[in-house]
Each structure stands twice: as structure tokens, then as C-alpha cells.
């Protein structure tokens, strides 16, 4: 390496990396610079030197890109929650198309150069879209603040006005910090592993109902806190306590108890209503979830004689879009609370052809096949880690005729397509901008078994 830590260098940014950073070459050394844009001439300082590349901090933009904009967020450069707010929104969508291409080029699944990559579907108003927040609580000079850890650190950045957060959820978390201060509730101490560490606030777009989870290392007295909070915000319908005594960075512990209110809030997507209990997963951008699930519906050509497996089904929201038009829908999820919600939701909607079971897809699917169940199509919506190796082998063994892969991580998607394209043809990839101003995107992939 010809560069050293703390060295200041000029740099021409040639392209954007998958995490939104600018990439340039300094005397044949690859340099990653967060905050820099393609085409810019910058001045930066080396912060880390690795075996094959270096990382740098942006000091000055000598020649700015015409696509650079001033972020409206006051904590954008310190928070780390968003990575590309300084890039004009239409160009953010182009960037996300390119991220998919970069991932495919890296992993090279069969036929990737001929894949149809459709333009990313964006939002008309890409602000205040997050219907869920998970903020950490810490004490600053005796005053309680809520926010996010700065990227790569345990330094909390207080946030009282997040540009991408739903305004009601932001107002509620601001009130919560005031009440935690007022009632002297214990704040998390990393050394003692004690106190309130995280607050989750989620709003259902269809009903404006709100649920809250207080994550604490031990039981805390919240009666007066709950009384004043629910009086100030009647939209709050559920307050739950999650016990987490772990030293790890895991947000939640295993036990969640509802302290006040109803068990679930009501949400809707594609004209289907369903219940969400506090610990169940649901997409955090309700507006774009309509778009995303609509693309899943378009991608499957199924009819009244077909059977569908909905892997990683959550509360069943994707499968319900098909339950009224197919012979059966079966789903599974490792979170038992989600399966309980899915079962209740199916019953409430009168879908007696929908069946849900708690457990791992790679264990349950072979069991169903041994019992005689044959899926014509499978939908997978895995976490960022992608498909489990055992599940990949299971899919390739049983080979449903159609498959839709919903991905929230283009790298693991491209990796999994290396295996899937041994049996399936990729008809197209349609990305949906679920997370404006971040480097992340969601993609719907239509696959058909090769004849």
C-alpha cells in the first residue's frame, strides 16, 4: 500500500459502492470515501488501510457532482441511519439499479448478463416513510435522550426530528423520553447491564393504531408512565415489556409481556386486513409495501388448482393476496408469535385453505412433501442473511414450477441465484425503494423452472 493512515490525498471518484460510498483510485490503491459522489474531485484523509483497499474521510469537495443536494436532516452526517441523502432522489433510484448489477457481476449466476433488471420503483414523497422506530435510550448530563448509535460505534446520536421517520412515531418517542426523565425510570447502564435500553414504536398506517415495546433488563414500574403517555396519545393501543438481560447487541430478549392494552394493532395491505402483535415482523414502509406485494402478485401466474408455500411468512400478509385465488397456501416462520397472528388473520378473513406452522422452512417443507403436499409455487422473503443452505437444497430438490424471491440484500440474493439458476430461469428483477435515502433496496425476482 502506498497510502498511510492520516495521509491527506486528492481523489477522483469513479463510481459508487454498494454501501453508498464513493470509490476512487490513488496510485492504484482502491479508496472508499463515504459522502463522495461519482464524478466528483475531492480531498480526503485516509482513516484505515486494509490489504486490498483503503478507507478515507471526506474533507472537501473541490468539484461537486450536479446530482449533489444538501441533506435536510441536521444529524445526517453523524447518525449513520441514511447513507445517500446527499444524492438527488431520482439518482438514488439509478444507484439502486446499479447495486443489483454490481452484486450480479460479483457472484455471476448463470445467465446474469441477460437478466432483465427493471428500473427501481420509487416514492413520490420519499420522507417520513418509516412506520416503525427502534431507538436506544441513554442519559446525557442527567437528561434522557433517544436516538441511534453512530455507524460503527456505541456513541448515541440523539434524534428528536428524523426526516425519514413517521411524524407520529417521532412525537411519541420524544414524549417517552420526557416521561422517562419525569418518573426517573432507570436507563440502561452497559457496565451493569441494567435499565431500559431500547424503545420500539410502530404505527399501523391503515388504522393509526400504535404499539410500543419497552426493552429492559428487568421489570420496571411503568403504570404512571403508561397512564400519561396514553392520555397524551390515544393512538397508543398496546404497551409491552420485553426482558433482555443479555450482554450481546441483540435488541430483544425471548420474553415479551403486554402490560397495557390490546394484543395487536390492525393493519391493511392490498385490501386485506390483519393483526400485528408487538414482536412480529412487518415491512417498515407501508406505502411501498403495497407496491412490493403488488409486484409479488404480478410475478406468480397461479390459479384455482395451485398450491403455494409462503416461506418466512411472518403474519401471512403476502400469502393472503393469493389465498382467495388458489387451492391452498401454506406458510411457516421461526417466530411463533407471527404464526399465531397468521393463524388468527386467516381465520378472521375466512381463508380455511391457509395453514401456518412455526418452525424452519428447511425442516417443515420436507415434512409436508412426505405427507403428500406438493407446491406449484414458492415465495421466499428471507432476512438479510439470505436463504439457509439447507433450504436452498430443499428447493432445488423439490423444484416447484414457479418461485418468487423477495430480497432485502442484493449481495445474498446474487449469491443464492448462483444455486437457483441451476434449475430456474430468472425472468426479471424488479426492485422497489423501501428505504429512500439509504443504500438498501428490496427486490422481487421472478423465477421459472427450466424445461
Curated annotation (Swiss-Prot):
[4Fe-4S] cluster binds at residues 73, 79, 82, 162. GO terms for molecular function: 4 iron, 4 sulfur cluster binding; metal ion binding; rRNA (uridine-C5-)-methyltransferase activity. Keywords: 4Fe-4S, Iron, Iron-sulfur, Metal-binding, Methyltransferase, S-adenosyl-L-methionine, Transferase. SUPFAM superfamilies: Nucleic acid-binding proteins (SSF50249), S-adenosyl-L-methionine-dependent methyltransferases (SSF53335). Its EC number is 2.1.1.-. S-adenosyl-L-methionine binds at residues 283, 312, 333, 381. It is an enzyme of class 2 (transferase). It holds the Pfam family tRNA_U5-meth_tr. GO terms for biological process: rRNA base methylation. CDD domains: AdoMet_MTases. The active site is at residue 408. InterPro entries: MeTrfase_TrmA_AS, MeTrfase_TrmA_CS, NA-bd_OB-fold, SAM-dependent_MTases_sf, TRAM_dom, U5_MeTrfase_fam. Belongs to the class I-like SAM-binding methyltransferase superfamily. RNA M5U methyltransferase family. NCBIfam families: rumA. This is Uncharacterized RNA methyltransferase spyM18_1615. It comes from Streptococcus pyogenes serotype M18 (strain MGAS8232). The lineage of its organism: Bacteria, Bacillati, Bacillota, Bacilli, Lactobacillales.
Amino acid at each position: 500500500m502506498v497510502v498511510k493512515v492520516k495521509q491527506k490525498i486528492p481523489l477522483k471518484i469513479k463510481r459508487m459502492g454498494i454501501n453508498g460510498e464513493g470509490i476512487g483510485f490513488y496510485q492504484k490503491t482502491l479508496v472508499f470515501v463515504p459522502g463522495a459522489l461519482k464524478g466528483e474531485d475531492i480531498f480526503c484523509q485516509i482513516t484505515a488501510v486494509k490489504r486490498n483497499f483503503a478507507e478515507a474521510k471526506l474533507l472537501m469537495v473541490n468539484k461537486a457532482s450536479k446530482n449533489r443536494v444538501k441533506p435536510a436532516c441536521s444529524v445526517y452526517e453523524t447518525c449513520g441511519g441514511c447513507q445517500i441523502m446527499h444524492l438527488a432522489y431520482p439518482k438514488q433510484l439509478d444507484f439502486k439499479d446499479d447495486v443489483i448489477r454490481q452484486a450480479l457481476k460479483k457472484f455471476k449466476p448463470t445467465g446474469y448478463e441477460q437478466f432483465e433488471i427493471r428500473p427501481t420503483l420509487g416514492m413520490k414523497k420519499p420522507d417520513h416513510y418509516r412506520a416503525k422506530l427502534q431507538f436506544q435510550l441513554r442519559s446525557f448530563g442527567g437528561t434522557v435522550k433517544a436516538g441511534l448509535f453512530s455507524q460503527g460505534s456505541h456513541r448515541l446520536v440523539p434524534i428528536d426530528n428524523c426526516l425519514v421517520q413517521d411524524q407520529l412515531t417521532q412525537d411519541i418517542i420524544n414524549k417517552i423520553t420526557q416521561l422517562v426523565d419525569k418518573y426517573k425510570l432507570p436507563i440502561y447502564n452497559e457496565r451493569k447491564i441494567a435499565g431500559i435500553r431500547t424503545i420500539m414504536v410502530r404505527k399501523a398506517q391503515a388504522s393509526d393504531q400504535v404499539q410500543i415495546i419497552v426493552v429492559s433488563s428487568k421489570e420496571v414500574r411503568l403504570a404512571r408512565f403508561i397512564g400519561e403517555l396514553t392520555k397524551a396519545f390515544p393512538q397508543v393501543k398496546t404497551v409491552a415489556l420485553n426482558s433482555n438481560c443479555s450482554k450481546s447487541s441483540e435488541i430483544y430478549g425471548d420474553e415479551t409481556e403486554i402490560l397495557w392494552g390490546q394484543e395487536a394493532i390492525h393493519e391493511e395491505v392490498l385490501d386485506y386486513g390483519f393483526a400485528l402483535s408487538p414482536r412480529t415482523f412487518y415491512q417498515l414502509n407501508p406505502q411501498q409495501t403495497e407496491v412490493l406485494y403488488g409486484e409479488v402478485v404480478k410475478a406468480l401466474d397461479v390459479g384455482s388448482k395451485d398450491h403455494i408455500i409462503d416461506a418466512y411468512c411472518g403474519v401471512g400478509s403476502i400469502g393472503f393476496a393469493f389465498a382467495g385465488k388458489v387451492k391452498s397456501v401454506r406458510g411457516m416462520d421461526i417466530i411463533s408469535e407471527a404464526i399465531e397472528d397468521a393463524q388468527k388473520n386467516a381465520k378472521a378473513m375466512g381463508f380455511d385453505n391457509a395453514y401456518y406452522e412455526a418452525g424452519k422452512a428447511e425442516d417443515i417443507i420436507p415434512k409436508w412433501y412426505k405427507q403428500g403436499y406438493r407446491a406449484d409455487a414458492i415465495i421466499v422473503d428471507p432476512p438479510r442473511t439470505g436463504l439457509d443452505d439447507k433450504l436452498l437444497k430443499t428447493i432445488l430438490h423439490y423444484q416447484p414450477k414457479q418461485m418468487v424471491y423477495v430480497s432485502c440484500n442484493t449481495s445474498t440474493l446474487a449469491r443464492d441465484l448462483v444455486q437457483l439458476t441451476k434449475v430456474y430461469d430468472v425472468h426479471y428483477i424488479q426492485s422497489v425503494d423501501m428505504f429512500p435515502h439509504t443504500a438498501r433496496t428490496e427486490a422481487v425476482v421472478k423465477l421459472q423452472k427450466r424445461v
